[in-house]
Amino acid sequence: MSQSGKNGLTYSDAGVDIDAGNLLVQKIKPAVRSTRRPGADGEIGGFGGLFDLKAAGFADPVLVAANDGVGTKLKIAIDADYHDTVGIDLVAMCVNDLVVQGAEPLFFLDYFATGKLDPDQGAAIVGGIAAGCRQAGCALIGGETAEMPGMYSSGDYDLAGFAVGAAERGKLLPSGDIAEGDVILGLASSGVHSNGFSLVRKIVELSGLGWDAPAPFAEGRKLGEALLEPTRIYVKPLLKAIRETGALKALAHITGGGFPENIPRVLPKHLAAEIDLAAVKVPPVFSWLARTGGVEAKEMLRTFNCGIGMIVVVAEENVAAVSQALEAEGEKVVTLGRMIARAEGAAGTVYKGTLAI
């Protein structure tokens, strides 16, 4: 006989709790409302989210879309039972990819999949997503919560995010005038951000430390909490600098692959980025990871951001104006190098100096 007796099986008997899903929707409505912006005034719960480009102030917009996830950083959140900030990471990984193309993030949608839905856990996650949307100035207009028993182990979940932004036609980055001698600026990261966490977890395993242990690199913080420091969202400072100075030629979001994989993505084939590694101020978390795991500098640079989360390319005469605009918005700016000529088939990122780890 089924758990529901003579009435037969229910969806709940199969492991899907519709009531829990409805409760989650009620819990997250205030957070979702807090992300409203011009162009997005609808309520969640419809079949699709709406956005009015004209109301957002665009005349001849080009839409830019990005999607991403948080990777195995989620495993630390699950094991440490700390879910409040991974939603910020989810938004950051998408909207930072939009702003590097000169686009203003407009709206965001999320996908949250789990084996068994915990409404409180889900509300914490979506609360983080809403916080990230507020930081980026985009609206959370919809999402999908999938309870899938048998697909995920107990307590496990995964996240995916989808962001759409816009820029006026002719204002997209990178510009077509990047030249030899242009200066490369770096914006400080907030920590490991959301890449390289499979290696992070392996190093922590080697260290023998638990997630509740004091973080060796962050006084007064637990290891898990410190490693879960959310990814910095660079959107508003960069958009302001773009609009105020008109001098930003290219931006590169330093994610998986580090400097050597990400910087060349925005450069013409005849130019390379010459980075002075001595100028990189490596935060303590990366020094600890390198020492504890015996990770060589080259591997650190192709796995982690090593303290620089965003690259900005400007003409030499505009360095002061762009730096001042970004610093006024709270960014830490460092001059990292310059553009040099690149031979055919040569690397798009070259180094001088030594990384101090």
UniProtKB/Swiss-Prot annotation:
Positions of transmembrane segments: none
Enzyme class: ligase
Principal subcellular localization: cytoplasm
Catalytic reaction annotation: 2-formamido-N(1)-(5-O-phospho-beta-D-ribosyl)acetamidine + ATP = 5-amino-1-(5-phospho-beta-D-ribosyl)imidazole + ADP + phosphate + H(+)
A GO BP entry: 'de novo' IMP biosynthetic process
CC terms in the record's Gene Ontology section: cytosol
Localisation: Cytoplasm
Family matches, as Gene3D superfamilies: PurM-like C-terminal domain, PurM-like, N-terminal domain
Signal peptide range: none
Alphabetized CDD domains for the sequence: PurM (cd02196)
EC number: 6.3.3.1
One Gene Ontology MF term: ATP binding
Keywords of this entry: ATP-binding, Cytoplasm, Ligase, Nucleotide-binding, Purine biosynthesis
Pfam family, one: AIRS
InterPro entries, per database record: PurM-like_C_dom, PurM-like_C_sf, PurM-like_N, PurM-like_N_sf, PurM_cligase
Keyword ATP-binding part of the UniProt annotation: yes
Pathway in which this enzyme or protein is active: Purine metabolism; IMP biosynthesis via de novo pathway; 5-amino-1-(5-phospho-D-ribosyl)imidazole from N(2)-formyl-N(1)-(5-phospho-D-ribosyl)glycinamide: step 2/2
Family: Belongs to the AIR synthase family.
Protein name: Phosphoribosylformylglycinamidine cyclo-ligase
Organism this protein belongs to: Rhizobium etli (strain CIAT 652)
